């Protein structure tokens, strides 16, 4: 837990998907945002459960907090979002980047989602534009478009920068989604449909142009070498030490490295169920005539 001035950040690590979910809490107003939640999913049985989300709910209630926002940094391809479950339990507005609509169009077509699937973003309460300001209680926040990694031809990837209005830059926090990882692991892959290494490099530079003391909160930690979980870095640390994107690595070098590395990677285990659910803001597909919901597996299409 990081607590500075009115801004308090708590991370919750899910070892099954290597995902970190966050509570961003304004101690002054007792208001919070939840970022990148996880719906537990067993791909062998097709069963969902709520252990990870219930940890967030329990902690929010311990804090006595009111949920103002449930935020997604992007349409995740490696875990399912628990946003609807959290919203039902705690309230709050669901937000993502405005380019979710292009993601929905692309993947609605891939999964043949049908006419009942809305591809205009209406499943979300707020579609953030690049540079759009908003508040979490008395905390100031800004949404920055940081595409390059996620599926979709104009990805909905966002970085959310949050600060106490009266605090120094060292008290700012940026939730970077899958742009950067901890310095010893590097950066996100770019080989999903619509991903692009050159675009990601430029997005990373947006993040690394923030104040050097800005704390960066990762969406994942893959524990290279079996080390303990780590998910907080700073702009300065990433500039100095990131194995893929430190100072001195050119755009051309990054693109060549990223493209060469990505061709060696298999698809994430949960990419097909994740994208189908997350393009719907975490809602499961509608039940069919027999009352059962289904995840589709498009053959030879991804």
Regions found by a protein language model. Give the residues of each.
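Active-site metal-binding motif and surrounding structural segment of the metallo-beta-lactamase
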Residues: 46-95
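Short aromatic-enriched loop/helix-cap "lid" or pocket-rim segments at secondary-structure transitions
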Residues: 47, 106-109, 187-188, 227-232
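Acidic/polar short surface loop at catalytic or gating sites that assists cofactor/ion binding
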Residues: 94-124, 261
């Amino acid at each position: 837990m990081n607590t500075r001035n009115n801004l308090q950040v708590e991370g919750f690590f899910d070892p099954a998907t290597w995902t970190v979910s966050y509570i961003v809490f304004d101690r002054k107003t007792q208001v919070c945002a939840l970022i990148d939640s996880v719906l537990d999913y067993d791909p062998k049985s097709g069963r969902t459960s709520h252990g990870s989300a219930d940890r967030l709910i329990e902690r929010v209630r311990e804090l006595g907090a009111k949920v103002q926002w449930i935020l997604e940094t992007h349409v995740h391809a490696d875990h399912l979002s628990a946003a609807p479950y959290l919203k039902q339990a705690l309230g709050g507005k669901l937000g993502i980047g405005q380019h979710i609509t292009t993601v929905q169009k692309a993947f609605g077509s891939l999964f043949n989602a049908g006419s009942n699937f809305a591809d205009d973003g209406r499943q979300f309460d707020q579609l953030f534009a690049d540079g759009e300001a908003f508040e979490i209680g008395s905390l100031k926040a800004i949404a920055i478009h940081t595409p390059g990694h996620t599926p979709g031809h104009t990805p909905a990837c966002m970085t959310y920068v949050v600060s106490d209005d009266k605090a120094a830059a060292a008290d700012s926090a940026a939730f970077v989604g899958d742009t950067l990882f901890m310095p010893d692991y590097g950066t996100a892959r770019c080989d999903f449909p619509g991903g692009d290494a050159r675009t990601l490099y430029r997005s990373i530079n947006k993040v690394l142009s923030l104040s050097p003391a800005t704390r960066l909160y990762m969406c994942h930690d893959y524990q290279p070498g079996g080390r303990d979980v780590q998910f907080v870095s700073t702009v300065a640390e990433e500039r100095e030490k990131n194995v893929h994107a430190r100072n001195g690595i050119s755009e051309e070098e990054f693109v060549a490295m990223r493209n060469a590395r990505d061709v060696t990677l298999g698809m994430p285990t949960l990419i097909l169920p994740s994208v189908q659910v997350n393009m719907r803001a975490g809602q499961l597909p509608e039940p069919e005539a027999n009352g059962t919901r289904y995840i589709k597996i498009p053959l030879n299409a991804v």
